[in-house]
Every structure is written in structure tokens, then in C-alpha cells.
UniProtKB/Swiss-Prot annotation:
Protein name, entry field: Dihydroorotase
Naturally occurring in which organism (per UniProt): Geobacter sulfurreducens (strain ATCC 51573 / DSM 12127 / PCA)
HAMAP family per record: PyrC_classI_B
PROSITE patterns for this protein: DIHYDROOROTASE_1 (PS00482), DIHYDROOROTASE_2 (PS00483)
Pathway(s) it belongs to: Pyrimidine metabolism; UMP biosynthesis via de novo pathway; (S)-dihydroorotate from bicarbonate: step 3/3
Length: 425
């Protein structure tokens, strides 16, 4: 089907565009951008007056739990949640059951996503076999089967020597390494950020040094091997300082943060709220301010949700034993738009961090509205006001710390390959 998107504020940092334009889509690709374009016979029309039109948003860090953990989420429900949140593409982490450390699992994900998914799914393979940190996975096979990056996300690669070899091998393969930066010996039995709140609640803490030390190690290894490195879910002031300094030295390091790290602090854990339990943990107000500053100055390249669904039975337990992680696909856009309202980011800068930069980091042919590009488009209603309600969420799991929050901003239309896969009705 052909489509004309009329009269929206088109923001495409890849072309330096920020103006009211029409977009004509033909055969799943961008045919033309211009003013006063006419709809061809039989074309659908999207009235985007008063709305913002951007390259399709990309979440480069999600857990779809498929295969093996479909009671939490699966490719169908996960991509439905992505579409509802305005995402046209997601990159799914390998901590499935079995772990995505081989061609067969990757091929399953690619095939199921193509057959049943609403949005593009780009698999991330495991750095090590079984994500056990003992031996490297076959990165060449993973890339050939469709993986766009490798990560042991959920666990760090403990061995520095193995991480060095991973960076060297991945560089040769032309595939990005995504680091889960965490020193487990410093984490110990910690379950939340170490500080005043953990002491008050009587919970064992995770020091900021656990993230900072691991970030420093991986940055130095990237510098030593002259290899690209992406650091996931950055949450501390110290890690951001390390990354900022590394970038200034010319190290090929990029990083992401998640909306919860610029929207919540460890105060959210009060009341032993297991929906505020994730890894890395929510940090202090000083860390939150540092995350916003790093978004503003470009130290942080991308915003990614770390969407981590869990069954109610895995969260409705004592805080110490509750699993880490929260869902985020459907709340990311309004929480991120708040950064624009607060003056932390301009709208074009936000689009860069949610579309253009993730595409560039992962090396995927998305994140642009250039003529001839795949017509992955997000149409945003910045004025939409809505309340986060468990029953209205598309995700199979409901483990969100934002339940009951009033949000401003939503995806009016999510368009994948020229097809409207979500419209806000």
C-alpha cells in the first residue's frame, strides 16, 4: 500500500531537516519529501497536522524472552508493545533459553519475527558460549545468521583476557560488542544502590564502584585493541566521566542510558517496591543529574529501554529475591519527551538518540527518511495525555515502576516498511 503523510513537523537529523513537510511512501520506501504533495490514486493518507514525524524509533536494548521464557514475553507481544511505544525496530538481547549463542537460535528469532512480529527485530548474539564467560561464541556464524551485535547482557564478561579477545575478534568480524559493565565481586549480595536509602531499608547495597570499575576496564581494553565498544545501561556519574574522557582521547566508545535512570532515583525503592528493582540499580539524585548532563553534552549516544519483562510471581515476592528488571517499551517515548520539556535536549537531539544513533551503532540501514530508504516512520503526538495502566499495556508483563503515572506524549502512528502497524485510537 502507498501512503501520504501530510503536514507534520518532519524531524530527520540525518538530513538536517526540521520543517513542516509531506512524505510520500511507495512500495514500502520513502518516495519523496516536499510541500503540497498529492496522494496517488488508492494511497492511504495520514493527517499529521500538529504532529511530529521522525525516522522510526529504534530500541537497541530489549529482552523479548523468546525462545524459552515466553511466559514473560514473546516476539508477538514484545513487538506489539514496541509498536505501541512508537518503535519500528528493536534489538533483542541473547539471554533467552537456550542462550542465543549459535546460528540455530538466531535463525529461529529472525524467522519468527518475520512471520509474526509487528516491527523489525534485530538479534544480539552472545559474546561467550552460553553467556558463561568461558569461551567465545562463534561470532562469524552469529553475524551470518543475522545478529547485529554481541553481548553477554545480564552478566559481565569477567575475564579481562577473554574480553580483550572478544573485542579483537568482533572488530575483525565487523560486529559491535555491547558491554554489561559490572564487577560482580563488588556487587556481592547487593540488591539496590548502596547509600542512605539502602541503609534505611536494611537492604544490602551495590556500590557505584561496581559499575565504574568495569566500565574503566572495558574502555581501556577498547583503547588498547583500537576496537569499537558500546556500553549498555550507564547509570553512574563516574562511568559517564570515564566515557566522556575516553571519547575526548579518541576511544571508539559509545553508550546508552535508560529512561528510568533519568526519571527515578533509589527513593523509588522505598516501600520495598520490586518494580523499582533492576540492574544496574536506580542511583542517587546526583547520578540522575549527571545522566541528564551527559545526554545534553553528547556523552550518552542513545536512549534504550532495557525492556525486561517478568511474570507477576517473580516480582510479587520479598525484595531480596525478586528478579531484576522492568518493562519500558510503552513508557520510553513520553519519559524521553520530558527531557525536551525540561530543556535537556532539543527534539532533533532526542530523535538522534532514539533513532539515528542506534542505527549507526548497530550498523543497520535505518534511522533516516532519505529518499529510497525503508519507510520506517514514527508519528508522535506530543500533546497526548494518558495514564499508565497495567490493563492497557500491550506487553505480556506489567512490571513497571510508572504504573499510575500521567504521561504526556505518545506514538500516534507507527509505520514499518510503509505499513501502519499501530495507530492511537
Amino acid at each position: 500500500m502507498n501512503l501520504l503523510i501530510k503536514g507534520g513537523r518532519v524531524i530527520d537529523p540525518s538530513q538536517g531537516i526540521d520543517e513542516v513537510l509531506d512524505i510520500l511512501v511507495e512500495n514500502g520506501a520513502i518516495k519523496e519529501l516536499g510541500k503540497g504533495l498529492a496522494a496517488p490514486a488508492g494511497a492511504g493518507v495520514v493527517d499529521a497536522a500538529g504532529l511530529i514525524v521522525t525516522p522510526g524509533l529504534i530500541d537497541m536494548h530489549v529482552h523479548l524472552r523468546d525462545p524459552g521464557l515466553e511466559y514473560k514475553e514473546d516476539i508477538v507481544t514484545g513487538t506489539r508493545a514496541a509498536a505501541a511505544g512508537g518503535f519500528t525496530s528493536v534489538a533483542c538481547m541473547p539471554n533467552t533459553k537456550p542462550v542465543n549463542d549459535n546460528k540455530a537460535v538466531t535463525s529461529y528469532i529472525v524467522a519468527k519475527a518475520k512471520a509474526e512480529g509487528l516491527v523489525n527485530v534485530f538479534p544480539v548474539g552472545s559474546i561467550t558460549q552460553g553467556s558463561k564467560g568461558d569461551a567465545l561464541a562463534e561470532m562469524g556464524d552469529l553475524k551470518e545468521a543475522g545478529c547485529v551485535a554481541v553481548s553477554d547482557d545480564g552478566r559481565p564478561v569477567t575475564s579481562s583476557e577473554l574480553m580483550r579477545r572478544a573485542l579483537e575478534y568482533a572488530k575483525g568480524m565487523g560486529i559491535m560488542v555491547i558491554s554489561h559493565a559490572e564487577d560482580l565481586s563488588l556487587v556481592g549480595e547487593g540488591v539496590m544502590n548502596e547509600g542512605f536509602v539502602s541503609t534505611e531499608l536494611g537492604l544490602k547495597g551495590i556500590p557505584w564502584a561496581a559499575e565504574d570499575a568495569a566500565t574503566a576496564r572495558d574502555v581501556y581494553l577498547a583503547e588498547f585493541t583500537n576496537s569499537p565498544l558500546h556500553i549498555a545501561h550507564v547509570s553512574t556519574m563516574g562511568s559517564l566521566r570515564i566515557i566522556r574522557n575516553a571519547k575526548a582521547r579518541g576511544v571508539k566508545v559509545t553508550c546508552e542510558t535508560a529512561p528510568h535512570y533519568f526519571s527515578l532515583t533509589d527513593d523509588a525503592v522505598r516501600g520495598y517496591n520490586t518494580n523499582a528493582k533492576m540492574n544496574p540499580p536506580l542511583r542517587t539524585a546526583d547520578d540522575l543529574a549527571a545522566v541528564k548532563e551527559a545526554l545534553k553534552d553528547g556523552t550518552i549516544d542513545a536512549i534504550a529501554t532495557d525492556h525486561a519483562p517478568h511474570h507477576l510471581d517473580e516480582k510479587d515476592v520479598e525484595f531480596n529475591v525478586a528478579l531484576n528488571g522492568i518493562i519500558g517499551l510503552e513508557t520510553s517515548l513520553p519519559l524521553s519527551l520530558k527531557l525536551v520539556e525540561e530543556g535537556v535536549l532539543t527534539l532533533p537531539a532526542l530523535v538522534e538518540k532514539m533513532a539515528c544513533n542506534p542505527a549507526a551503532i548497530l550498523g543497520i540501514d535505518r534511522g533516516t527518511l532519505r529518499q529510497g530508504a525503508v519507510a520506517d516512520i514514527t508519528v508522535i503526538d506530543p500533546a497526548a495525555v494518558w495514564t499508565v495502566e497495567a490493563g492497557a499495556l500491550a506487553s505480556k508483563s506489567k512490571n513497571s515502576p510508572f504504573l499510575g503515572w500521567e504521561m504526556k506524549g505518545a506514538a500516534a502512528y507507527t509505520i514499518v516498511g510503509g505499513t501502519v502497524v499501530h495507530s492511537r485510537g
